[in-house]
Amino acid sequence: MKETENRGRVPRLRFPEFRESGEWETIPLSQLAKRSTQKNNRGELNSVLTNSAEFGVVDQRDYFDKDIATQGNLEGYFVIEKGDYVYNPRISKMAPVGPISKNNIATGVMSPLYTVFRFNNSHNDFFAYYFKTTGWHQYMRQTSSTGARHDRVAVTNGDFMAMPLPVTLLEEQQKIADCLSSLDNLITLEAQKLGALKTHKKGLMQQLFPAEGETVPRMRFPEFRDAWQIRKLEEIADFFKGKGISKADIDPQGQTPCIRYGELYTEYNESIKNVFSRTNVSPSELFLSRANDVIVPASGETKIDIARASCVKLDQVALGGDLNVLRPNIDGLFLSYILNGPAKEEIARTAQGDTVVHLYASQLKLIDLPVPGHEEQQKISDCLSSLDDLITAQAQKVGALKTHKKGLMQQLFPVLDDTPG
């Protein structure tokens, strides 16, 4: 595959055997596919599918963990067969004009709010990949408006089916689809490896820490034999509270590294070795970490979600408001792992609130924890930390492959510059 001059309707990257095949055509969707408007009139189908921006077409029960549509109102739903495509007009950060996805699972029914269509040619994976690019977004923006709810695109059926699509020789279409499919298979394989590592870690943590009501773990390093001691959290840590750092205080060029409580949910795991945010707030107005501190959110959305902890391995990191700061006299990383493992359910039970959940130091102090000697603490935290390093490296590999795929798709399809104004 070689990069070509971006002249006319030609992709930037093209397989060598097609470089002399000329420009691609632009053909309206209506000439390549037909809308599917078959209704579930007798209610014979009860498998309700949905089209999510992240996962594509999935069973509604798997996506929402429950049935959203009820059996009585399925007769007005569209039938969607395996191989059909569906447009969901709901906009999101991942799908700014709504997602178009191919149904690769099974025949089912779709909400009448969706647009279902079927390509004339059954070999159409090429278009499934095209719809994952942003190449068609500009057309949708120019021919539609945001619905009354401000979270949906309003587009007529005629305008939608008039959408221009890039078309080349069937052989080139198939080559592109095969290339991207191979990359998808690689991403799936690496993601499965990542999942296996996470599952292994979860099982290992269950064996390296004593079960509830016990003082000896099921799996133990051979040099250790003494029973673990049950200690209240207030006996092994001093408690502090972080100081507020607003979003406006974040400065990529700031002098002081900082952690805001929301980042515990998105950026960090049990060990914090590198910090992503910085601030220029005066150090005198900040609460600064000592290496080995453990931080726990003071507020969150759900009780189980708030039950998490991270060990800050660095000195002089500003710790934001809404963070409980524990300064332990034991190994902080060990404490972080045990709070995320066997103590997680107990922490969740102590949290208070419904819409916004709070976790107070006074509650955390009373939690009982099984604690071994310092050398065994270190051995356990080193073991789990090494596994975390493998998980991080594998996650970065999966992320890099996804980024590569995204960039490749943008280059394998030409830019359409003749959309209506």
Functional labels for PLM-detected ranges:
Residues 1-20, 185, 189-229, 396-421:
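Short amphipathic coiled-coil heptad-repeat segments
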Residues 91, 179-181, 300, 383-385:
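Short, surface-exposed secondary-structure boundary micro-motifs
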Residues 7-9, 107-113, 145-171, 247, ...:
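A short glycine-rich beta-alpha junction/loop motif
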Residues 42-50, 142-144, 246-254, 350-351:
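Short coil/turn segments at secondary-structure boundaries
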Residues 10-40, 220-243, 366:
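Non-catalytic DNA-recognition/assembly elements of restriction-modification systems
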